[in-house]
Regions:
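Substrate-binding cleft and catalytic face of glycoside hydrolase catalytic domains
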Residues: 22-33, 41, 55-162
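Glycan-binding loop/region signatures in secreted carbohydrate-active enzymes
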Residues: 1-46, 50-51
Length: 162
């Protein structure tokens, strides 16, 4: 078994499970995505790696592998599913997630935008309309008010050139 991780491998480790942490139908915009598909049944992914529930175990495994940080994204549509309506349960989830990272001794690296949008924001034209940036700023302000004290590293946009 290969357990000798190079420094490059440790530095480049990403959390693919975190990108697929939600169960089928769990995201507020899921019905819109599935209904637009040529074959909606082809979009069912089940629980994927079930990272949403097993994150503490995943963090322990990452620490055992020698990782020192954990990059993940915050799902805007969970935090603000309706325009101006903040989801207290979603915020509580991310606070618990960050606490589990701290307990595991992993430095959180938070990505604010990783390609998904709340349905209401997309309906307004998303980022294609310059005036809509104010909604993203409002989301970021709220998020940092809630978790900013526990986070040192923030990535604004995942892969901004994509």
């Amino acid at each position: 078994m290969h357990n000798q991780w190079s420094e490059w491998e440790k530095a480049q480790a990403k959390t693919l499970a975190a990108q697929s942490q939600y169960q089928y139908g769990d995201l507020p915009n899921w019905p819109h995505i599935a209904s637009a598909a040529k074959d909606p049944n082809n979009y069912i992914s089940g629980k994927a790696a079930n990272h949403a529930e097993l994150y503490a175990q995943d963090f322990a495994l990452a620490k055992k592998m020698g990782l020192t940080s954990w990059r993940f994204s915050v799902e805007w549509s969970r935090i603000e599913p309706e325009e101006g309506a903040w989801n207290a349960e979603a915020i509580k989830y991310y606070k618990a997630y960050l606490a589990a990272l701290a307990d595991a001794g992993l430095e959180p690296v938070v990505t604010l935008f990783h390609f998904t949008l709340p349905v209401w924001f997309a309906a307004r034209g998303g980022f294609a309309k310059r005036d809509n940036v104010k909604y993203f700023v409002r989301f970021v302000d709220k998020l940092m008010d809630e978790i900013g004290a526990t986070v040192r590293y923030v990535i604004t946009i995942n892969e901004p050139c994509v």
